[in-house]
Regions:
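Tandem CBS (Bateman) regulatory domains
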Residues: 2-33, 47, 67-68, 72-123, ...
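A short beta-loop-alpha structural element at the N-terminal edge
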Residues: 37-41, 103
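Long hydrophobic segments that form regular secondary structure
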Residues: 42-43, 50-59
Length: 156
């Protein structure tokens, strides 16, 4: 019953065989409700949103809803902000274009490799496997590690 609970919690069909991390995809463990900011969000609003969030990186979308990058709190926290600056700067001015992201069809093992290579990153945006401009979720390093532990316990 533990295996079935694991499957259902990840949204994996019961006929899909899980033997290794290669059998679990990022889309199975990602969080689908993602807070995003529009590219024209003012700097002071960005600070407000980040300060009330558990995430330190925020996905930025353009007016069409396409994923264009992330704003990373570590990049902006040291900026000395005067009131005029905070009204002039918007998200698209400080966005990191083409950020590190995962594709929804990547395996759990591939996701772990990305997090191992970038140990300073705790969350990654997940984009559609076919359309890399479509943001479909977010996955944390803890989500990946927790799924690995559950898989290891299941196999022992």
């Amino acid at each position: 019953h533990v295996v079935e609970h694991f499957r259902s919690s990840l949204g994996i069909p019961s006929h899909h065989k899980i033997k290794s991390a290669a059998d679990i995809l990022v889309q199975h463990i990602m969080r689908k409700n993602v807070d995003t900011m529009c590219e024209d969000t003012h700097f002071n609003e960005i600070l407000r949103l980040i300060s009330h969030s558990k995430y330190d990186r925020f996905p930025i979308v353009n007016k069409e809803g396409d994923f264009i990058g992330v704003v990373d709190y570590s990049d902006i926290r040291d900026l000395v902000v005067d009131p005029a600056f905070s009204q002039l700067v918007v998200a698209k001015d400080i966005v990191k274009p083409e950020p590190l992201s995962l594709h929804s069809d990547q395996t759990l093992g591939e996701a772990l490799d990305v997090f191992r290579s970038h140990s300073n990153i705790t969350y990654l945006p997940v984009v559609d496997a076919e359309n890399h401009k479509k943001l479909v979720g977010i996955v944390s390093q803890n989500d990946v590690l927790s799924s690995f532990r559950t898989l290891e316990n299941k196999n022992n």
